[in-house]
Curated annotation (Swiss-Prot):
Keyword Nucleotide-binding: no
Keywords: Activator, Chromatin regulator, DNA damage, DNA repair, Nucleus, Transcription, Transcription regulation
GO cellular component: NuA4 histone acetyltransferase complex; SWI/SNF complex
Principal location class: nucleus
GO molecular function ontology, one term from the record: chromatin binding
Organism from which the protein derives: Yarrowia lipolytica (strain CLIB 122 / E 150)
Family: Belongs to the actin family. ARP4 subfamily.
Annotated protein name in UniProt: Actin-related protein 4
Subcellular locations according to the entry: Nucleus
Transmembrane parts of this sequence: none
UniProt cross-references to InterPro entries, sorted A to Z: Actin (IPR004000), Actin/actin-like_CS (IPR020902), ATPase_NBD (IPR043129)
Subunit structure: Component of the NuA4 histone acetyltransferase complex, of the INO80 chromatin remodeling complex, and of the SWR1 chromatin remodeling complex.
Entry function: Chromatin interaction component of the NuA4 histone acetyltransferase complex which is involved in transcriptional activation of selected genes principally by acetylation of nucleosomal histone H4 and H2A. The NuA4 complex is also involved in DNA repair. Is required for NuA4 complex integrity. Component of the SWR1 complex which mediates the ATP-dependent exchange of histone H2A for the H2A variant HZT1 leading to transcriptional regulation of selected genes by chromatin remodeling. Component of the INO80 complex which remodels chromatin by shifting nucleosomes and is involved in DNA repair.
Organism superkingdom: Eukaryota
Length: 432
């Protein structure tokens, strides 16, 4: 984490640091504008205790009970009895505001931030709903009591993080992969594309392969002890006795294994895989929490190929429509659907961001595919080599924007909120 001081903003005659929150499907990033990386990154997936399992004093307030009911941060990774794991976002937008508000409040408390003195910048996807915009501002002004707030499109923020006012942003998140054109800092909505074939989808492909090979995916929290075994030998381990741990918690911990595999093992072939071109990948060894280890070669490529040709990698009992578009196809579709006057700008400024984009070879493959499909345009891809910059692109862009003095005029003040109301601000003024 960076140790540089937050960049101050002049607000109400005083210099204060802007708070920036980027709420993603898997992780929420919180920090101060002007810094290089977020101060805090917490899981957006949080725990929910049943009312009868919430411990509290007799005189505990309803607010404290509500906070105890939700388990956020490290406590969400504890195998607590009867704790269900919530996924507060659906299709990349907030569906459970109680959970998200708890995540924000927990994170800001960890920062010891006095929200009454800091403007708050929040990121949002370009397909966010009007109702969600209103709710985000309501929490900012009514619950957190911030003096000013602003909702910035995550694609715009990612473009600014890459130093671009014009860009075509390919964001591969956990739930959603999206392609968004940005011209002069504004989103072009009509040509934008998104799909569900993103990080979580790749995790499912990985799980399908591992299960087909008979690999035990027992998560770490269930393992009491294990013995070292030779590569390829069956694991030898003892399970913990943990009564009343929910399936949703176990599923979350298994997903952590799949994410580790994805980050360290998966690779995108430089050309599309076909029956004639199976691709070659050097064998790599992966050790599972049980102690079992084995090598993976071709599977490292075939799982990742699903991001580019999802219709060819269906799951049992499910049908992927033939019209499902892969990452490169969405980029090409978006450029072709954009006004002819901006296509060259977009093709020459493709920004790739998001944790799901860190699969080895993904950026090169997108570049080659798009160059081949759009031979009349000069294609240039920008993808941060630093993993943290790629994972936190939208937050970093929000940090850049929040530290600009020229951005000050765009803030919505609490006074405006109180005098004109959220409906006016959302529908008619700033955030439509």
């Amino acid at each position: 984490m960076t140790t540089t001081a937050p960049a101050p903003q002049v607000y109400g005659g005083d210099e204060v640091a802007t708070l920036v929150i980027d709420t993603g499907s898997s992780y929420t990033r919180v920090g101060y504008a002007g810094e290089d990386t977020p101060k805090l990154v917490v899981s957006t997936e949080c725990g929910l205790m049943a009312d009868e399992d919430v411990e509290m004093e007799d005189d505990t307030s309803n607010t404290t009970k509500k906070l105890n009911k939700y388990k956020v941060g490290d406590s969400a990774n504890l195998p607590l009895p009867n704790m269900e794991v919530l996924h507060p976002l659906t299709d990349g937008i907030v569906a459970d505001w109680d959970a998200v508000q708890n995540i924000w409040e927990y994170s800001l408390a960890r920062l010891n931030a006095d929200t009454k003195t800091h403007p708050l910048m929040l990121t949002e996807p370009c397909w966010n709903t009007q109702a969600n915009k209103l709710k985000a501002l309501e929490i900012a002004f009514e619950s957190l009591e911030v003096p000013a707030s602003y909702l910035v499109k995550d694609a715009v923020a990612s473009a600014f993080a890459a130093g671009k006012g014009n860009a075509l942003v390919l964001d591969v998140g956990s739930e959603v992969a999206s392609v968004t054109p940005v011209i002069d800092g504004l989103v072009l909505y009509k040509p934008a594309r998104r799909s569900q074939y993103a990080g979580d989808y790749l995790d499912r492909q990985i799980k399908k392969v591992l299960v087909s090979r008979g690999i035990d995916l027992t998560p770490r929290f269930e393992i009491k002890n294990k013995k070292a075994v030779e590569m390829g030998e069956p694991p030898v381990f003892t399970k913990r006795e943990l009564p009343n741990v929910t399936h949703s918690f176990t599923d979350l911990q298994v997903s952590r294994i799949l994410s580790e595999f994805k980050d360290s093992m998966c690779q995108v072939n430089d050309v599309p895989l076909t029956p004639e071109i199976s691709g070659e990948a050097a064998d790599r060894v992966f050790e599972f929490p049980t102690g079992y280890s084995t090598t993976f070669g071709a599977d490292r490529l075939s799982t990742s190929e699903s991001l580019f040709k999802p219709s060819e990698y269906p799951f049992d009992g499910e049908t992927v429509p033939d019209t499902a578009r892969g990452l490169s196809e969405m980029v090409v579709d978006t450029i072709n659907a954009s006004n002819v006057d901006v296509r060259a700008h977009l093709a020459n400024n493709i920004v790739i961001t998001g944790g799901g984009s860190l699969v080895q070879g993904l950026s090169d493959r997108v570049s080659k595919d798009v160059t081949q499909a759009l031979s009349g345009l000069k294609v240039r891809v920008a993808a941060a080599s630093n993993q943290e910059e790629r994972r936190h692109g939208a937050w970093i862009g929000g940090s850049v924007l929040g530290s600009l003095g020229s951005f000050h005029q765009l803030w919505v003040s609490k006074q405006e909120w109180q005098e004109k109301g959220g409906d006016y601000l959302v529908e008619k003024k700033r955030f439509k």
